Amino acid sequence: MKAELIAVGTEILTGQIVNTNAQFLSEKMAELGIDVYFQTAVGDNEERLLSVIDIASQRSDLVILCGGLGPTDDDLTKQTLAKYLGKALVFDEQAGQKLDAFFAHRKQTARTPNNQRQAQLIEGSVALQNQTGLAVGGLITVDGVTYVVLPGPPSELKPMVKNELVPLLSASHASLYSRVLRFFGIGESQLVTALEDLIKYQTDPTIAPYAKTGEVTLRLSTKADHQALANERLDQLELQLLSIRTIDNQPLRRLLYGYGEDNSLARETFELLKRSGKTITAAESLTAGLFQAQLTDFAGASQVFNGGFITYSIEEKARMLGIPLVELQRHGVVSSFTAEQMAAQARCLTDSDIGIGLTGVAGPEELEEQPAGTVFIGLATKNKVESLKVVIGGRSRLDVRYIATLYAFNMVRKALLKSENLL
């Protein structure tokens, strides 16, 4: 089924509001296995709206109109669609009762004539009741094309779509099931190159790569009648792609860190720390507390984190962490020595199981003859201290600092998995 979204409202065309409804509806249609091919915005003008509806009806099976259901004269979506379809407008009793209750609550004796427009419905439509507003929506199929009218305010549109529209549409369509795989340590272009043949010849399931700051996700999607069938297809595709090797001969499964739309390296690390019963601390220089801030975003962070340090200057590294100033000056702030000492001292001072040290050059200028983007990350446990050097080139200060924390979380994650013989 091909769908088209039509946003009605001059305020969209003038930039007064952002059309967030289009994104929401596109996501919902995708979940239902309905392909959105076109999105259009049109002002509050009957002639132009008639033209847009006519074009949509010739190329789409499902036409969804949003906005223009209110009580004013420029709210003309239902009236215009009724005119196009040659249908009358009728009064919906349930919506009318809601109007009466609304005005009674406001101590007004009767609804006003213009407000009655909000309870009107195109003759022959299925009513889509409005749980959070007054304007009733509707669904009608004419000559093989299904038309849907929805209110414009997102607070009204979203509940109507979820509770009224989706159940009607889902009864006749296979749903779209998706699985999101999250990778760290590989760029989007490298990942796409590794998966070139799979992506080039894909049909169903499909593979869609997305780049985020410092990481890449793959969305695997399939249309299926039920979850079990979808899982079978997605499992097969995942097994196939994770066995593929990158240009430097790494299997992709070693770069996979988790699943899910809202997952992150910080969350994965946090959950591993909780599961293992281990605690962590950090001493941060260039990241200035960003690592600790991400860790404490999660409820229950106190189970794994007691406290940490922000030691931005060389003097504070010596004073707060007890690292000899002469050694810091000899090795340099931007060095593996300093990162390891920061991690080890922070761990000892807080009696934590794991210590992280972050030091480097956020930029844009170099420091100690080290180019911008140079980062050293130390990791200390009771039995071992190690460090990692990464160069995050061509990035802003903000990106360098954030990506540095991703490398730190990944170090901790891998160390925890190794301790459980899972890596």
Swiss-Prot record:
List the InterPro entries hit by this protein, alphabetically: CinA, CinA-like_C, CinA_C, CinA_KH, Competence-induced_CinA, MoaB/Mog-like_dom_sf, MoaB/Mog_dom
Q: What is this protein called?
A: Putative competence-damage inducible protein
Q: What is the lineage of its organism?
A: Bacteria, Bacillati, Bacillota, Bacilli, Lactobacillales
Q: Which residues form the signal peptide?
A: none
Family label: Belongs to the CinA family.
The record ties this protein, via Gene3D superfamilies, to: 3.30.70.2860, CinA-like, MoaB/Mog-like domain
Q: Which gene encodes it?
A: cinA
Among HAMAP family, the record links this protein to:
CinA_B (MF_00226_B)
User: CDD domains from the xrefs?
Assistant: cinA (cd00885)
